[in-house]
Amino acid sequence: MSLRIIVLAKQVPDTRNVGKDAMKADGTINRAALPAIFNPEDLNALEQALRLKDAYPGTTVTLLTMGPGRAAEIIREGLYRGADGGFLLTDRAFAGADTLATSYALATAIKKINDYDIIIGGRQAIDGDTAQVGPQVAEKLGLTQITYAEEILNVDKEAGRITVKRHIDGGVETVEGPLPIVITVNGSAAPCRPRNAKLVQKYKSVSYTHLRAHETDQ
């Protein structure tokens, strides 16, 4: 049994180390003054995807990110850890997109990719803390969603079911859902594995697919 997994990932400014130049006069983040990193909870999500790849031979893990050209850096980071490929959704038309526009763009890109069992991403990005994009993507695709996930326990593709442990107030619960499905992962999930030196060498000249706004029009 093999799975097709799409990991939603975002490059974000590192708001954990905020200096005096981190904010603009209008109260927005000065992204140029902060280092860009792989959103932490998206790394937790990537680890869950890679564990499924380890468990189910033939499984592929594909990263999907939206942003300017430099956002391709997180595709490289994913490849260095064991992902198989990536799509960069980039266009001036996406500049300043809110969560509604972002989720629409991601959902239309996913429809174009059109080969997935699991769509997984972090619960929220540290530059917005909205936790809206994952659920909105699920809604736009008409898929079931499981949020606040800590661990994927089992996948039965023949039965079309997945079992997930998720965090709730005061404890955890185990839930099942149908495939395909959208899952968002908490920061309390297992941290992502480090880079693999052999993969770093392999993907020095990384190849990934650019998608523009007109290519995802539905």
Regions found by a protein language model. Name each.
Residues I74-L100:
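A glycine-rich helix N-cap at a beta->alpha junction
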Residues I110-Y116:
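Glycine-rich phosphate-binding loop signature in dinucleotide/nucleotide-binding domains
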Residues T209-T216:
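Conserved small/polar residues in nucleotide/adenosyl-binding loops
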Residues G128-L141:
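Short Gly/Thr/Asp-enriched flexible loops that form oxyanion-binding sites at enzyme active sites
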Residues R161-V172:
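Anionic-ligand binding region
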Residues E176-K204:
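A charged, well-structured terminal subsegment
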Residues E139-E158:
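Short, acidic/small-residue loops that bind anionic groups at enzyme active sites
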Residues S2-M66:
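N-terminal beta-strand-loop-alpha-helix module at the start
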